[in-house]
């Protein structure tokens, strides 16, 4: 990694598999390096994958196979802006359909427990506007799991 700021994500043992999934799912994403452990470590043994360098939508990340001590939580999430329902559906279905879980308000978790916010731009634009339009869009969002772009647009119009 050459970036001065890299997100380090702790995985039990599947960092390489997760990184490959993210690279296949999101544009401007790739696995850039795989580093094997030079010796035994709490999550594995010499020769096992220790870290994986990758990008998600251009954001540099490192996956660390550290063992089961720490779990992902909603305290950290990737927010992915989408342009339309097709893009929203594609990302949501890839994450949830690959062993993930739906949550509320556009949030979901992948099979490794990492949280994602799949957020159509129409929603963030409405919330940024403030006022009655923001309140209507917010109220509509609060009833959803995956965000329905048509319903958000209808709420924006009143």
Identify the residue ranges that each predicted region occupies.
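Extracellular/periplasmic catalytic domains that process cell-envelope and extracellular macromolecules
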Residues: 1, 44-48, 55-56, 70-72, ...
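Short, solvent-exposed beta-strand edge segments and adjacent coil->beta transition regions
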Residues: 2-6, 73-77
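A charge-rich, low-complexity, intrinsically flexible signal that marks solvent-exposed coils, linkers
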Residues: 41-43, 74-76, 157-158
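A short, polar/charged loop-to-alpha-helix boundary motif
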Residues: 122-140
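Short, small/polar residue-rich loop motifs at catalytic or cofactor-binding pockets
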Residues: 4, 48, 101-103
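Core segments of cupin and vicinal oxygen chelate
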Residues: 9-58
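Vicinal oxygen chelate
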Residues: 11, 25, 56-60, 71-72, ...
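Acidic/histidine-enriched, glycine/proline-rich intrinsically disordered or flexible terminal extensions
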Residues: 134-158
């Amino acid at each position: 990694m050459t970036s001065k700021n890299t997100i380090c994500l702790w995985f039990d043992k599947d960092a390489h598999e997760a990184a490959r999934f993210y690279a296949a799912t999101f544009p401007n994403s790739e696995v850039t390096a795989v580093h094997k452990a030079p010796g035994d470590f709490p999550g594995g043994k010499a020769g096992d994958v220790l870290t994986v360098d990758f990008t998600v939508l251009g954001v540099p990340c490192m996956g660390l196979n550290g063992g089961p001590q720490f779990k992902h939580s909603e305290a950290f999430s990737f927010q992915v802006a989408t342009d339309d329902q097709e893009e929203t559906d594609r990302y949501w279905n890839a994450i949830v359909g690959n062993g993930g879980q739906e949550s509320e308000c556009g949030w979901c978790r992948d099979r490794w427990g990492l949280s994602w916010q799949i957020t159509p731009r129409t929603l963030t634009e409405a919330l940024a506007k403030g006022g009655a339009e923001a309140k209507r869009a917010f109220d509509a969002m609060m009833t959803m799991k995956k965000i329905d772009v048509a319903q958000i647009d209808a709420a924006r119009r009143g």
